[in-house]
Amino acid sequence: DRTYNLLQALTSTLEALDAYEVYAQDDSNGIFLELIEDERRHAERLLGELRSCLLAADR
């Protein structure tokens, strides 16, 4: 179901963010900082979709 899929995708995205933050400490090229920005944007979008889905289910 859509709510479950959004929740799982958000969980995976947040786990990736945690890992990238660790990797960024040893990264001199900045690739992980770029990935962190991308994943934060993805997490925000997923959270927004999850909120909308939950609000629609509550009606």
Residue ranges and their predicted role:
Residues 1-59:
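Iron-associated oxidoreductase/ferritin-like identity signal
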